[in-house]
Amino acid sequence: NNTEGINNNIFGTLNCAQAAISTGVETFVLISTDKAVRPTNTMGATKRFAELVLQALSSKNNNTLFSIVRFGNVLGSSGSVIPLFKKQIKNGGPVTVTDPNIIRYFMTITEAVELVIQSGSMGEGGDVFVLDMGEQVKIDDLAKKMIKLSGLQIKDDLNPDGDIEIKYTGLRPGEKLFEELLIGKNTSETDNPRIMRAKEEMMEWTKLEGILDELRIAINENNYLKLRELLIQAVPLFKPQCDIIDILYKKIE
């Protein structure tokens, strides 16, 4: 649901940030995502908007130090493909992959936690830190390796008597074949070679606050077209690849 995504990712971040300021929290770290870079769907656009909120608040005089850490998928975390593939293999398949060419960044939970904590200590205010995720992994290869590591054979045209079939379901609306971690190329090194500081464009609080006010009104009016328009206004690199996908929007239509 688009409105709940906006409420959670944008206004949820804003509420937490304002609470941190009012209670004197010293450091606030936002966990962002590679989907915030040149977003093609509402989720990615709202995550980039959340980054803009913290960048704008950092430009105001307050005692809370805001930092943003942007990275990709975390192996074994909730919603990760690993637990899904394990479950599908255990149930006899098929293992579902959206596209044979789709690739994604991955890191372990331990790596992610350590780098996020270190990034928080490096922040100077409004920083966007990008973690070195290594090479992107082909999801199709990951699925095949997991089937083989389970002691099973892939069922396909070359091996029709195999155990587990891989089913290609097609990219979902707004889904990319690959993700990026940087909007621009303006980065600088930090004390940790696996953490880069990215210089990203920001928006002044006065302008952003006006868009936030308009978002609230559009949510109350269930104006989904206006919501998309405002997201594009705040995040110019948001390039929706499809019509608005939302059950409530379709019902209102």
Enumerate the predicted regions with their spans.
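Conserved Rossmann-fold NAD(P)-dependent oxidoreductase catalytic core, especially the SDR/UDP-sugar
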Residues: 2-51, 56
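Strand-loop microenvironment adjacent to phosphate/nucleotide-handling motifs in alpha/beta enzyme folds
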Residues: 22, 52, 56-73, 78-253
